[in-house]
Amino acid sequence: MKKYIVALDQGTTSSRAIIFDKEQNIIGVSQKEFNQIYPREGWVEHDPMEIWATQYSVLQEVMAKCNITQENIAAIGITNQRETTIVWDKNTGVPIYNAIVWQCRRTADICDDLKERDGLVDYIRENTGLVLDAYFSGTKIKWILDNVEGAREKAEKGELLFGTVDSWLVWKLTNGKVHVTDYTNASRTMIFNIKNLEWDERMLKELDIPRSMLPEVKNSSEIYGYANLGAKGGIRVPIAGIAGDQQAALFGQAAFNKGDVKNTYGTGCFLLMNTGEELVKSKSGLLTTIAIGLHGKVQYALEGSVFVGGAVIQWLRDELRIISDSSDTEYFATKVEDNGGVYVVPAFVGLGAPYWDMYARGTIVGLTRGTNRNHIIRASLESIAYQTRDVLEAMINDVGYDINCIKVDGGASRNNFLMQFQSDLVGKKVIKPIITETTALGAAYLAGLAVGYWSDKEEIAKLWFASEEFEPNISEERRNKYYKKWKKAIERSKEWAIED
């Protein structure tokens, strides 16, 4: 049997390639950052060719670094930033515009117009599981077709293709032979029906998107096509797993059972609860999404997306310049007994779940003459935990049962102050896995299952072990007192950007 699986992890700020062996040991990692493009306030773009160049180069680099040839790779799995939208020319393979990133708010006006259409908000919620928001791919596709010269005409002639980042990478890896996505990524577009598992005709009509642009939707674990990683005529490696980053992390955490919850602390924060084969409609502002698609069947999940999680730490470092390194936050946060009454609401691009307020903006409240740098840093870290509690409360309200623990991963999960505060604030155990690269691991698992590298989910579940556990150690009364103040701070940030 071939020895290794390669996971391509295409994220919001960097492209990574990670090689795993059968015992899920990490053999090698390569990573390259790429440019963030901000053409106007609230707009965020990436260059699709730079995404591809960085992703392919880290793949080559990690193989060379570990002295591994393609003969030893059983399969490639792909996980990606979701919702980010790329439209390219079918014949030349050249993108007609930059990738519009999930964080980008440029289509807020389109969303406002769509909200006026009879019954559309409810239809979207009922059939796509999503809320009508600029976050998702549908309105981004419409914007490109409406604003790039000649785009709509080319699309009508069947000359343009749309894809989320996974589709783009598969297209490039297979030299334009394969145009696919998986159920998890499709479920984030706002044009995919999560009940009948097909592109939704009404949504395509409402957004005026030709069906010919869309990729074929496949399972999250199957062979989609082959990549040639060496010289022409060399051994072809199967591309055999695809999942959006948050669903991949859920799978990588072995959260296979109904009621399992994970939170990924990345640029944003993403809480997912596996609801099994039950499609739970949220009453609390959460998304209903597809957790995974295997063997033509799907498991569903409830998701709460927090737009600014770890990004608040980047803001402290890059814009306020009150820390020089992200890891400094833990040190400074513990230099004060508490937040000094200061609350930071990092609604830089609006508020995600459960509020869905595109016009909210960041606020710092509770400042006094005695407030110092440490209070601001601590309150910024705490904001990540508060937003997580907002989402967790909504989830428990929707499903009608409690949970025992949260499995955590992502960059900010390395911050022990934050993890302890998180446990204190929600009153649940917080568990870190030994392998924290759960997103890449999920993609590796999916690819490995498709080619028989791992036999089944049961084998994978036995590989999952906890590295650290955090138990709550504050009273219920104190927990609720903190949270009440947070809710007050949230109210201050809402609807700030609405013009009077």
Swiss-Prot record:
The keyword Endoplasmic reticulum does not apply. It catalyses: glycerol + ATP = sn-glycerol 3-phosphate + ADP + H(+). SUPFAM superfamilies: Actin-like ATPase domain. Gene3D superfamilies: 3.30.420.40. The keyword Nucleotide-binding applies. GO terms for molecular function: ATP binding; glycerol kinase activity. Activated by phosphorylation and inhibited by fructose 1,6-bisphosphate (FBP). GO terms for biological process: glycerol catabolic process; glycerol metabolic process; glycerol-3-phosphate metabolic process. NCBIfam families: glycerol_kin, PRK00047.1. Key enzyme in the regulation of glycerol uptake and metabolism. Catalyzes the phosphorylation of glycerol to yield sn-glycerol 3-phosphate. Homotetramer and homodimer (in equilibrium). This is Glycerol kinase. It comes from Clostridium perfringens (strain SM101 / Type A). The gene is glpK.
